[in-house]
Amino acid sequence: MAKNILHMMTPLAHMSPFDVNMALDAGYDATASYTNVSLGEITDLIQDAMFSRSPRDAVRTGVFIGGKDALLALDMLDAAGKALFKPFEISLFADPAGSFTTAAAMIAVVEKTLKEKKDRALRGAPVSVFGATGVVGTASAVIAALEGASVTLVARDASDRTTRHAAEINRRFGVNLAVADGSTPQSRAAILTGAEVVLAAAKAGVRVLDAGELAGAGKLLIAADVNAVPPSGIEGVDAHANGTPLGERGALGIGALAIGNVKYRTESGLFKQMTESKTPLRLDFRQAFELARTLA
């Protein structure tokens, strides 16, 4: 019987040990890592992997795309898909730095908490994303926007990097992300005045909002933080929080471990789908969100 083999590709110097462990624990028989992979090398690598097995066993071959750049990972996934043709099609899965499954989990938990505890839909909700140009922030913003939320990317400095990033996301996905200056306490206070949902997706150990800033967020319903490394990204949001009261205005906190529980099962579940499917799969943040919704 053909073995389930996963070829794991990254533009970085090292493949993530986290993802290797996840793949093997989910049911892959073997993994092979390819590092420092450029976009231009994807086609040859994909076709090298697919031609080594009979059409009957092609689906037992999978490719995972990692890295730390959400848009580059999607470009690599697109290049990989274009390299395939029948009857040698194989399964593809992009999850750079675990960001697609983490973002999917965060939005799924936020959506569920909004509905069950605030009687509020995600669609139409004003959502502010801190750490917006990172991989998790990018994916979270796109998922929320595609679900109909009114999403603002919060810029932490005076450069136009966030504006350019938002323009590229809007172009690619047909959404309408806004950008707001969050470089000063005063500008962050202005952002929080209208936010119903705040997502903290900055680097581990970086606090983006303190309790004083949150105190002025009169419309805030949910504050979600993916940072598990002290200090928390949002002051007052414990890593274990899962719809836990935050402050005195009725807002609820969702912490990194509550999100991480769903993220872990989402990534594992997608790997399992690849090992068990009888047809080739193509997985990114969209399929991750579909699964995360059932797990939240």
Describe these PLM feature segments.
Residues 113-197:
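Glycine-rich phosphate/diphosphate-binding loop of Rossmann-like nucleotide-binding domains
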Residues 85-93, 123, 247-250:
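Glycine/charged-rich beta-loop-alpha catalytic/anionic-binding loops adjacent to active sites
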Residues 94-112:
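A glycine-rich, Thr/Ser-enriched phosphate-binding loop motif common to dinucleotide/cofactor-binding enzymes
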Residues 175-253:
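Rossmann-like adenosine-cofactor binding region
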Residues 103, 134-140, 162, 206-209, ...:
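Short glycine/serine/threonine-rich phosphate/pyrophosphate-binding segments
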Residues 37-41, 71-75, 101, 105, ...:
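Conserved active-site and cofactor/substrate-binding residues in soluble primary-metabolism enzymes
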